C-alpha cells in the first residue's frame, strides 16, 4: 500500500524542498471532505501506479486508509518527471467525474495498407459513482482499415455510467500515411 505524509505547510519553498528530497506533492479531495495536503515518495508512487490493476487504489495518509483515483497530474516540462498529482476520493454512492483510460487491442488491417493508427482520445470523461467506475475502455482495432475510426458512440456501454464526451468524437482511427 502506498504511504504518504501530511504536509504541515503548503508554501512554495516547503514544496520545493520536498521535491528535492524525492517526494511527490499531492492533494486529496472529495465532495464534503476536507482537502488533505500530502507528499509521497516519488519512486514508491511510480511503483504503486505500475502495479495497480484498477483505477481505484488505496493510500495511507496520517494513519487513515483512503480509496482514491488519480484526477490530474503535472510533469516537469524539461525533465518529464512528476511534480504534482491530484487524487480524488472514491466515495461510494456519490456521483463524480472521472477520466477512464482507453486501451487499444489488436493490429489494424489498415496498417498493412500504408495506414497509421491514430489515438485521438486517450482518456474518456465519465460521470458515475465509484462502485460503477470501469477500469478501462478496451477497443479492438483489428477490423479498422484506412479511413475508418471508432467514435465515442461505438464504445461499449456500462450500467450507471454516463459518458460526458460528445458521441461524434473519434477515439481511435487509421489515417493514410503521407
Curated annotation (Swiss-Prot):
Name of a matching Pfam family: Ribosomal_L25p
Listed GO CC annotations: cytosolic large ribosomal subunit
UniProt keyword annotation of Repeat present: no
Alphabetical GO biological process terms: translation
GO molecular function: 5S rRNA binding; structural constituent of ribosome
CDD domains: Ribosomal_L25_TL5_CTC
InterPro entries (UniProt xref): Rbsml_bL25/Gln-tRNA_synth_N (IPR020056), Ribosomal_bL25/Gln-tRNA_synth (IPR011035), Ribosomal_bL25_b-dom (IPR020057), Ribosomal_bL25_C (IPR037121), Ribosomal_bL25_long (IPR001021), Ribosomal_L25_dom (IPR029751), Ribosomal_uL5_bac-type (IPR020930)
SUPFAM superfamilies linked to this entry: Ribosomal protein L25-like
Gene3D superfamilies in UniProt: Ribosomal protein L25, beta domain, Ribosomal Protein L25, Chain P
Keyword terms: Ribonucleoprotein, Ribosomal protein, RNA-binding, rRNA-binding
PANTHER family assigned: RIBOSOMAL PROTEIN L25/GLN-TRNA SYNTHETASE, ANTI-CODON-BINDING DOMAIN-CONTAINING PROTEIN, RIBOSOMAL PROTEIN L25_GLN-TRNA SYNTHETASE, ANTI-CODON-BINDING DOMAIN-CONTAINING PROTEIN
Family classification: Belongs to the bacterial ribosomal protein bL25 family. CTC subfamily.
Function, in words: This is one of the proteins that binds to the 5S RNA in the ribosome where it forms part of the central protuberance.
Quaternary state and interactors: Part of the 50S ribosomal subunit; part of the 5S rRNA/L5/L18/L25 subcomplex. Contacts the 5S rRNA. Binds to the 5S rRNA independently of L5 and L18.
Protein name per UniProt: Large ribosomal subunit protein bL25
Source organism of this protein record: Helicobacter hepaticus (strain ATCC 51449 / 3B1)
Amino acid at each position: 500500500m502506498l504511504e504518504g505524509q501530511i504536509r504541515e505547510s503548503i508554501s512554495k519553498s516547503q514544496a520545493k524542498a520536498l521535491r528535492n528530497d524525492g517526494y511527490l506533492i499531492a492533494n486529496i479531495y472529495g465532495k464534503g471532505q476536507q482537502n488533505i495536503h500530502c507528499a509521497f515518495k516519488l519512486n514508491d508512487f511510480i511503483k504503486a501506479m505500475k502495479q495497480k490493476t484498477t483505477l481505484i487504489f488505496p493510500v495511507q495518509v496520517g494513519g487513515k486508509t483512503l480509496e482514491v483515483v488519480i484526477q490530474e497530474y503535472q510533469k516537469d516540462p524539461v525533465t518529464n518527471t512528476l511534480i504534482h498529482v491530484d487524487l480524488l476520493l472514491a466515495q461510494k454512492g456519490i456521483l463524480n467525474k472521472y477520466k477512464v483510460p482507453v486501451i487499444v487491442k489488436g493490429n489494424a488491417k489498415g496498417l498493412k495498407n500504408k495506414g497509421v493508427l491514430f489515438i485521438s482520445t486517450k482518456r474518456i470523461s465519465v460521470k458515475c459513482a465509484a462502485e460503477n467506475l470501469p477500469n478501462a475502455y478496451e477497443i479492438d482495432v483489428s477490423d479498422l482499415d484506412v479511413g475508418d475510426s471508432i467514435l465515442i458512440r461505438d464504445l461499449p456501454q456500462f450500467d450507471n455510467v454516463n459518458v460526458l464526451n460528445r458521441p461524434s468524437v473519434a477515439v481511435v482511427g487509421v489515417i493514410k500515411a503521407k
